[in-house]
Amino acid sequence: GCDSLAIAIGTSHGAYKFTPEQCTLNEQGILVPPALRFDVLEEVTKRLPGFPIVLHGSSSVPQEYVEMVNTYGGAMPGAIGVPEEQLRHAAELAVCKINIDSDLRLAMTGTIRKFFAEHPDKFDPREYLKPARANIKELVRHKLINVLGCAGKA
């Protein structure tokens, strides 16, 4: 049997889900990716009511962490993720699992890069992993409460 179904509605793995050419510029000059295919999600939900739906590659690629990575020696130009509002909408429809690993890796990598830039003499993992863990914890808290809508539902 099948326990859950991962459908393709416009997400993809990694930090480069969309090219700048696929996006539009908003009033603030920020690239906005195309909308997810909610029509496909709604059709699958109609045909398989109550069936667990999964979204792979659904990181929002927080720009504050992309900027942190880039500021402290990384090179991630054009990293664009799925807007959190769209992920929230997917969670409100039928999606029960949304994979956001790239967001966590960005938070950890950016924080560690910043730590080493500010403390080049340090080498103890207990020191540089402490702020990285704190940022990941805060990011997960934000996602659970504000994006995924699953805080307190364990």
What are these regions (language model features)?
Residues 1-52, 63-68, 72-80, 84, ...:
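Alpha/beta enzyme core
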Residues 71-72, 82-154:
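C-terminal alpha-helical cap/extension of soluble enzyme domains
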Residues 9-13, 59-61, 102-106:
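Glycine-rich beta-alpha junction loops
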